[in-house]
Structures are given as C-alpha cells and as structure tokens.
C-alpha cells in the first residue's frame, strides 16, 4: 500500500477527488493540518461522492504530529522545485507521496526533510506555476502503483 500525504490542503473539491482516488486504489490518505476547510464541507463531500467510507483517512493537527506518528514512512516530495522526474523514483510499499498546499506548495522546512534525490517533479511548461493538486496526486500515485504491479487492483 502507498500513502498519500497532503500537507495543509486548501481546496475541498481537490481533497474530495483525492479521497475518491485513494478509496479506489487502496492508498491511505494522511491530511496534515491545519486544513483550509472542515472535513464535512459540502464541496468536499460532493467531489468525494460516497467514497469517504471506503477510504482510509487519517488526520493530524500539524506536521510534527504526522512525523511523530509515522517516523519510519519514507517520503517522496512532489514539488515544482524537485529535480528528479517522477517516473525515475523507485517506489516501494509503505512509501508516502507528499504534496503541498495548492496556493504555495511545500514550505522549505518540510521539503528539506526529503533528500534532493527524493524530490520529484512532473514535467510541465517552464512558464507555468503548477499543476492541479488532485491531478498531480493521481499521476504520482498511479506511477507508484504501476511500479508495484497494481497489486490487489485487478
């Protein structure tokens, strides 16, 4: 199983889409606060449809709570400041795929907890700011699942 880690997500429909994605791929979702919304937000529920009960979602008040409860989870940070193409990562079961908030990405201190070799980037236009969070999570998660043979999904 892979873990999706959202650091301070801000937009409920993105998180709802990611809940649905995690439910359908058996990935565990970790929400690291403070969140930009409450989990019962109608927009989040609409985007996640009825998949919330199928998803394994864990919530943490802050980054230190997440790292304290998951001290051995290897992390891969997805960032426009990453230098490693995402498809060159060597994903393993139990890895965490870390994504920052929609408006600003991962802060330096959080990104700095991942060695440069574990900072991944999706290809995109150089004059563009970023890709949509839920799309980036889907691309990264499915690459990890592909590398692991889509175990338990067929």
Sequence positions of predicted segments:
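Post-transcriptional modification and biogenesis factors for structured RNAs
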Residues: 1-154
């Amino acid at each position: 199983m892979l873990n999706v880690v959202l650091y301070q997500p801000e937009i409920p429909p993105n998180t709802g889409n990611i809940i649905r994605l995690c439910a359908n791929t058996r990935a565990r979702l970790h929400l690291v606060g403070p969140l930009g919304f409450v989990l019962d937000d109608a927009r989040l529920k609409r985007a996640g449809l009825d998949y919330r009960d199928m998803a394994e979602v864990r919530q943490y008040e802050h980054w230190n709570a997440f790292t304290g409860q998951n001290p051995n989870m290897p992390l891969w940070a997805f960032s426009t400041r990453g230098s490693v193409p995402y498809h060159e990562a060597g994903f393993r079961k139990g890895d965490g795929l870390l994504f920052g908030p929609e408006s600003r990405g991962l802060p330096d201190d959080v990104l700095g907890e991942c060695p440069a070799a574990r900072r991944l980037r999706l290809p995109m236009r150089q004059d563009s700011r970023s890709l949509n969070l839920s799309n980036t999570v889907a691309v990264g998660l499915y690459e990890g699942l592909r590398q692991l043979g889509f175990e338990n999904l067929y």
